[in-house]
UniProtKB/Swiss-Prot annotation:
Occurs in almost all aerobically respiring organisms and serves to protect cells from the toxic effects of hydrogen peroxide. It comes from Solanum lycopersicum (Tomato). Its EC number is 1.11.1.6. One of its GO terms (cellular component) is plasma membrane. SMART domains: Catalase. Heme binds at Y348. This is Catalase isozyme 1. It is found in: Peroxisome. It catalyses: 2 H2O2 = O2 + 2 H2O.
Length: 492
């Protein structure tokens, strides 16, 4: 943060304590009272101002990803992909773009331990010369549900019981038993990767398919992958309990201390690309957010590196007020038809307006670092001083005009208006393939987690049978092992 820009200039600074209006404060310890024992007088303006400010100094926490930590750095292109995209920040090897990155847990509150089993958020804001690009992802490549109509229920099921405020397995397994597509995400959620050692040792994924468009207008679907150069490291359940009991902010501290010591975290960015003409060649829908793309058919392509080399200057200003939005894209990158992505474009901006205010994009951490101009005006906590006489467009008195058209996908979309699921669900194949790729001890930890969750006394026989059926359809031996430890017969 630039002190000369975001703090009072030296011409107006003072070594003495003042009110917000600049009036001198000569006592910051004792309230103004009638006699030494009181009562307190309401005319003690600074007391009232101090308390009123304190009462309002926090904003509503994020409904998800409330617990998190941020750091700043740069993204550098290392490999030429200009044949795939006309995005300026990806224009050529050596090009650098300033970034801010936020890591988080998903479900629990702002002060919760960072060692709990949970998906982690991995969000990167690129301050490009063409506007901000927000790649808002997680440390797993898939999500529980493919349609946003289920998203609020998904989060409520994962969050604590509204009566007791305790996270309970029976609620999670009850809800997701109606969403068989969630099994693939459970193959990550109940796996080691949802107990990362810290933020530096975890992968990141854009999760959704996007589109890259080159200067000729040719589009390719794309998925983004972040690979940590220091490798992936995870904790056991026992280690997580010990670490969380010792320091509930262990991952934040590790990130901060590593950067302060000059041990800068680094990730390599890879992409997978797919020609839109090949979408129907797979036994699943490539735009289904509950699926991954096979790397043997669509190999990882190296793009660049992300280096975090600066700690934030103020946690509230650059972490709590930091706002991401998948709707923030730049020329050369576009959305896919992924149903969940399409609705996140609206939902993220909406929640930031509620959480921070309608002018959240004017905050330094959120504002683009390139020129920007529109007629979005005024509103609560507006921080701009504009003296234009014309606040409409078009106008012969204002030289502002629409930007030149940049390439966007030109595919033809058609179909009946309907509420339905996608044709190729294929809910279990990839979950089974992931399970079979593990060593036996890792499989055993996964099975034990299922047994522990399904042993919740409020999980009914019906719910257990449904989940054993799902697990058996993914991998017969996995379902049998869970069933045998629960003494429940698998049903197909």
């Amino acid at each position: 943060m630039d002190p000369s820009k975001y703090r009072p200039s030296s011409a107006y600074d003072t070594p003495f304590l003042t009110t917000n209006a600049g009036g001198p404060v000569y006592n910051n310890v004792s309230s103004l009272t009638v006699g030494p024992r009181g009562p307190v007088l309401l005319e003690d303006y600074y007391l009232i101002e101090k308390l009123a400010t304190f009462d309002r100094e926090k904003i509503p926490e994020r409904v998800v990803h409330a617990r998190g930590a941020s750091a700043k750095g740069f993204f550098e292109v290392t490999h030429d992909i200009s044949h795939l995209t006309c995005a300026d920040f990806l224009r050529a090897p050596g090009a650098q773009t300033p970034v801010i990155c936020r890591f988080s847990t998903v479900v629990h509150e702002r002060g919760s331990p960072e060692s709990i089993r949970d998906i982690r958020g991995f969000a990167v804001k690129f301050y490009t010369r063409e506007g901000n690009f927000d790649l808002v992802g997680n440390n797993v490549p898939v999500f529980f549900n493919r349609d946003a109509k289920s998203f609020p229920d998904t989060i409520r099921a994962l969050k604590p019981n509204p009566k007791s405020h305790i996270q309970e397995n029976w609620r999670i397994l009850d809800f997701f038993s109606f969403l068989p597509e969630s099994l693939h995400t459970f193959a990550f959620f109940y796996d080691d990767v949802c107990l990362p050692t810290d933020y530096r040792h975890m992968e990141g994924f854009g999760v959704h398919a996007y589109q890259l468009i080159n200067k000729e207008g040719k589009a390719h679907y794309v998925k983004f992958h972040w690979k940590p150069t220091c490798g992936v490291k995870c904790m056991s359940e026992e280690e997580a309990i010990r670490v969380g009991g010792t320091n509930h902010s262990h991952a934040t501290k590790d990130l901060y201390d590593s950067i302060a010591a000059g041990n800068y975290p680094e990730w390599k960015l890879f992409i997978q690309t797919m020609d839109p003409e090949d979408v129907d060649k797979f036994d699943f829908d490539p735009l289904d957010v509950t699926k991954t793309w096979p790397e043997d058919l669509l190999p990882l392509i190296p793009v660049g590196r992300l280096v975090l080399n600066r700690n934030i200057d103020n946690f509230f200003a650059e972490n709590e007020q930091l706002a991401f939005n998948p709707g923030h894209i730049v020329p050369g990158i576009y959305y896919s038809e992924d149903k969940l992505l399409q609705t996140r474009i609206f939902a993220y901006a909406d929640t930031q307006r509620h959480r921070i205010g309608p002018n959240y994009m004017q905050l330094p951490v959120n504002a683009p670092k390139c020129g920007h101009h529109n007629n979005h005006r005024d509103g609560a906590m507006n921080m701009t001083h504009r003296d234009e006489e014309v606040d409409y467009l078009p106008s012969r008195f204002d030289p502002c005009r629409p930007a030149e058209q940049y390439p966007i996908p030109s595919c033809v979309l058609n179909g009946r208006r309907t509420n339905c699921v996608i044709p190729k669900e294929n809910n279990f194949k990839q979950a089974g393939e992931r399970y079979r790729s593990w060593e036996p001890d890792r499989q055993d930890r996964y099975i034990n987690k299922w047994v522990e969750s399904l042993s919740d006394p409020r999980v009914t026989h019906e719910i257990r049978s449904i989940w054993i059926s799902y697990l058996s359809q993914a991998d017969k031996s996995c379902g049998q092992k869970v069933a045998s430890r629960l003494t429940v017969k698998p049903t197909m």
